[in-house]
Amino acid sequence: MASGALRGLAVAGGGESSDSEDDGWEIGYLDRVSQKLKGPLPGEEKSETFKKALTTGDISLVQELLDSGISVDSSFRYGWTPLMYAASIANVELVRVLLNRGANASFDKDKQTILITACSARGSEEQILKCVELLLSRNADPNIACRRLMTPIMYAARDGHPQVVALLVAHGAEVNAQDENGYTALTWAARQGHKNVVLKLLELGANKMLQTKDGKIPSEIAKRNKHLEIFNFLSLTLNPLEGNLKQLTKEETICKLLTTDSDKEKDHIFSSYTAFGDLEIFLHGLGLEHMTDLLKEKDITLRHLLTMRKDEFTKNGITSKDQEKILSALKELEVEEIKFGELPEVAKLEISGDEFLNFLLKLNKQCGHLITAVQNIITELPVNSHKIVLEWASPRNFTSVCEELVSNVEDLSEEVHKLKDLIQKLQNERENDPTHIPLMEEVSTWNSRILKRTAIAVCGFGFLLFICKLTVQRRYPNICF
C-alpha cells in the first residue's frame, strides 16, 4: 500500500469482538483511485486483491473482481462478508453495488447482523442513514438482536442518530425492546446524553417508565450520568410528545420525520433534525410549543420565565391556560418550603418540658433537612463550567448569597451555644436547689419500689410462719393453734 495511507483494523460494530485478531483488514485509501487486473489471479491472491479493493473503496476493481467470478458473499477469515465490511465503514456506494450484485442483506455472524453493523458504523449520520435505508429496502429485519439482545435501534440511539432511529421504527422496529440489562433505546439515549434522540423516541411512543434490571428508569440513568437537562425533561409529568407518531403508517412516518435534500442524491433520505435549547425542551414538555416564537421575540429566557409573576405573564401575552401549565410544572420542581410556623411557641413561661423538647427536636430535624439539601446540590452541580446546560446569572451573585449563608449559619451556631449554656445553667441550679420537689414520675417510681419490697417481705414472713405451723403440728399433734 502507498506510503501515507491510513491503516487500521475493521472490527465488529456495536462492541462485538471478532473471533480472530489477525484478519488483516486494512482501512485506508490508495494513492491510485482505481486499479485494473492484469490477467487472471490465483484464488488466494484474488481474495487478497478483493479485500484490498474493499478497504480502499475501489468500486471499479470490486466490480471487475465480481465479474471475474469471485462470490459477492465471500467469507473472509473471521466470517465477515464484503457487505458487512462495507456497512461497517458506511460506504454507501459500495453497499449499493454489493446489494445490486445479490449480496445477502440478512447475513449475520454470531448474531451480529449487517443492519446492526451499519447502525453502529463509523461515519456521518447521513452516510449511515443511507446504508440503513438500502439494507431495509432489501428486507433486513430491524428486530433481530445481537448476543447482548441489543437491536439496531438501540445502537442507533446509543450513537446519537435520531433519523436512523426514526427510519428503523418506520420499518417496524420495536421501540420499547429491552437488552440483557433491561436497557431500551430511550435508556441508551438518556445514558449517552443524546437529547435529539430522546425527543424523537418520545414522539415515536417510547415508554419512559420501563425499568432496567437494577430498577432504574431512563430519567434516573440520565441523572446518574450527569445529563441534567434530559433528566429534568424526562421527569416532567406532562409529555405531549409521547406517541405523537405512533399511529402513523410507515409511509406517513417517513414523510413526516425525514426530508429529502434536493442538492444531494434525491433517492436517499437523511437527517434534517434541529437541536432544541433548554427553553424549547421545557415548552415541549408542557405542550406549549406555540409559545416558543413569542418568548424568543421578547428575549425571555427559561430562567426569566421560571421567575415571572402573574402580572408579568399577562403583560407578555401569555394566556391564563398557558400560565396554569407553567405554574403547575413549577410546583413539581420547587423545593418544599420549611414551615417554621408549625413549630410550637416557646416564648411562654408556662411552656411544658415536653413542648420545649418537641421544639428542639423539630428544630434539629429542620437543620438536618437543610444539610441534606446542600449536600444534594453539591453532588448535582457540574464540576466544569462548560457542562452547565441551563442559563445562569453571574457566579458572583451565587458566591455572595453563599457568603451570607455562611454568616447566618455561624450566627445560628452562636445562638444555639447560648441556648445550650442557658439550659445547662438551669439544670445545675435545679439539682442544687434544696427546695426542689421531685417530679411526680420520680416520686411514683420511688413509692412503687417501697410497696414492692414491703409486699415481698410480708409474703416471705407469712410463708415462714406457715412452715413453722406445719412443723409444730406434726411434732405436737395435740397442740391447737
From Swiss-Prot:
**Residue ranges under compositional bias (Low complexity)?**
1-10
Tell me where in this chain the SAM domain is found.
272-334
Q: Where are the ANK repeats?
A: 45-74, 78-107, 110-144, 148-177, 181-210, 214-243
Segments of this protein annotated with the region Disordered: 1-23
One annotated Gene Ontology cellular component of this protein:
pi-body
Give the sites modified to Phosphoserine. 17-18, 20
Q: Which Pfam families match?
A: Ank_2, Ank_4, SAM_2
What is annotated about its quaternary structure and interactions? Interacts with DDX4, PIWIL1, RANBP9 and TDRD1.
Q: What does this protein do?
A: Plays a central role during spermatogenesis by repressing transposable elements and preventing their mobilization, which is essential for the germline integrity. Acts via the piRNA metabolic process, which mediates the repression of transposable elements during meiosis by forming complexes composed of piRNAs and Piwi proteins and governs the methylation and subsequent repression of transposons. Its association with pi-bodies suggests a participation in the primary piRNAs metabolic process.
Name under which the protein is recorded = Ankyrin repeat, SAM and basic leucine zipper domain-containing protein 1
Q: Which organism is it from?
A: Eulemur macaco macaco
